[in-house]
Curated annotation (Swiss-Prot):
<dbReference type="InterPro" id="IPR052036">
    <property type="entry name" value="Hydrolase/PRTase-associated"/>
</dbReference>
<dbReference type="InterPro" id="IPR007815">
    <property type="entry name" value="Emycin_Estase"/>
</dbReference>
<keyword id="KW-0378">Hydrolase</keyword>
<keyword id="KW-0719">Serine esterase</keyword>
<keyword id="KW-0614">Plasmid</keyword>
<comment type="function">
    <text>This enzyme confers resistance to erythromycin through inactivation by hydrolyzing the lactone ring of the antibiotic.</text>
</comment>
<protein>
    <recommendedName>
        <fullName>Erythromycin esterase type I</fullName>
        <ecNumber>3.1.1.-</ecNumber>
    </recommendedName>
</protein>
<dbReference type="GO" id="GO:0046677">
    <property type="term" value="P:response to antibiotic"/>
</dbReference>
<keyword id="KW-0046">Antibiotic resistance</keyword>
<dbReference type="InterPro" id="IPR016273">
    <property type="entry name" value="Emycin_Estase_proteobac"/>
</dbReference>
<dbReference type="Pfam" id="PF05139">
    <property type="entry name" value="Erythro_esteras"/>
</dbReference>
<dbReference type="GO" id="GO:0052689">
    <property type="term" value="F:carboxylic ester hydrolase activity"/>
</dbReference>
Length: 406
């Protein structure tokens, strides 16, 4: 196993690129690189991500960043990124969840792009992370009026059926989905299916009369709504404790499709994915033997140009999502929680033995590893780490990001 310590990983403005040359063999030939995090809302992970973004952009010419949010959410963030609006105005272009997850990285990114003169494309590779279909429905209503006006009343009907699904997180939105009558849920799902099949059936005719970009956007919004409704159903059962093994894979399948489609359609794109380790890994996600999910990374692993870099830490605590939290607009609060114990067969113990505990450590999984577990949130994920990730970044602690007011 190849490894080295780094002193500047958490100093993106003063980065020593020589410390990152260990990653060159991993990144060469890649067009998709996932930069993970073992938990959301961690200050050190945001700093380390900023450093790796700099490295990938300046040394390997990556030109796009994908976020765990919907396309419309990302378009608003992109508007802010390319405007004269200051850091203090980011919340006006964002929602509470996206700001909490990505605020620190985005504020750094805006400053970096301004000072360096570089340009980066910002895209949403996910469903709306609120699982609120309102924005997708609104955009679809505008487009369908132009490309298939006979279906505009149908979209309006869907908007009415789903009007109460207006949460700011999956916790809230899935609960509101559960409050809908079963007949209303089924009518919404069948309504989206009808739209999808009609658009596909009429595609040769519709494409002759409308801008191809409009048709693609309509198809994209319908697909997003379809996956969102199924994910709402799944998350309701997940929070109720009645979901089936692997159910949450639906969202990961969607993300993989978006990324794969983008890279195939744009041969010059080289994209950095900022997502949780559990979405990026190239093996099934499991915490105690059961199948939790087939992650996005396992789908993307079928491409020879995908790489996954995980983040973990050695700290005694980690920010964790605590729910229910009725006073929070997201239905959960972020609480500093004891991290899972570092065990003999863990990645964290390997780092301690190899690199010590004083500095951050970069490790390539270029040889079989005895480590078969790694911290994830306040637990540990169990997998063959040398198959799951191409490299693993370990920082010494995991503190709550100062921008997170949850």
């Amino acid at each position: 196993m190849t490894w080295r310590t780094t002193r500047t990983l958490l100093q993106p403005q003063k980065l020593d690129f020589n410390e990152f040359e260990i990653l060159t063999s991993v990144i060469e030939g890649a067009r998709i690189v996932g930069i993970g995090e073992g938990a959301h809302f961690v200050a050190e992970f945001s700093l380390a991500r900023a450093s790796l973004i700099r490295y990938l952009v300046e040394r390997h010419e990556f030109n796009a960043i994908g976020l765990e949010c919907g396309a419309i959410q990302a378009s608003r963030l992109s508007e802010w990124l390319n405007s004269t609006a200051g850091a203090h105005e980011l919340e006006r272009f964002s929602d509470t969840l996206t700001f909490s997850v990505y605020g620190s990285v985005l504020i750094w990114l805006k400053s970096y792009l301004r000072e360096s003169g570089r340009k980066l494309q910002l895209v949403g590779i996910d469903l709306p992370n609120t699982l609120n279909p309102r924005d997708d429905l609104a955009q679809l209503a505008e487009i369908i009026q132009l490309i298939d006006h006979l279906m505009k009343p149908h979209v309006d009907m869907l908007t009415h059926l789903l009007a109460s699904i207006d949460g700011q997180s999956a916790v809230i939105s899935s609960a509101k989905w559960g409050e809908l009558e079963t007949a209303r849920q089924e009518k919404a799902i069948s309504g989206v299916t009808r739209l999808k099949l009609r658009l596909a059936s009429l595609a040769p005719v519709l494409k002759k009369h409308v801008n191809s970009d409009l048709f693609r956007k309509a198809s994209d919004r319908i697909e997003s709504i379809e996956y969102t409704l199924e994910t709402l159903r799944i998350m309701k059962t997940f929070f109720d404790g009645t979901s089936l093994e692997g159910d949450t894979s639906v969202r990961d399948s969607y993300m993989a499709g978006v990324v794969d489609g983008m890279v195939r359609a744009n041969p010059d794109v080289k994209i950095i994915l900022l997502a949780h380790n559990n979405h990026l890994q190239k093996t099934p996600v499991s915490f105690s033997g059961e199948l939790t999910a087939v992650p996005m990374g396992q789908h993307l692993a079928e491409r020879v140009n995908y790489r996954a870099i995980a983040f973990t830490h050695l700290g005694p605590t980690v920010p964790e999502m605590h729910f229910p939290s009725p006073k929070s607009p997201l239905g959960f609060s972020v609480v500093t929680t004891p991290a899972d114990a570092i065990r003999e067969d863990s990645m964290e113990q390997y780092v301690i033995d190899a690199c010590g505990t004083e500095n951050s450590c970069l490790t390539l999984t270029d040889a079989p590893m005895e480590a078969k577990r790694m911290r994830s949130q306040s637990a540990s994920v169990e997998t063959k780490l040398s198959e799951a990730f191409d490299a693993i970044v370990c920082v010494t602690s995991a503190g709550k990001d100062s921008l997170v007011a949850l």
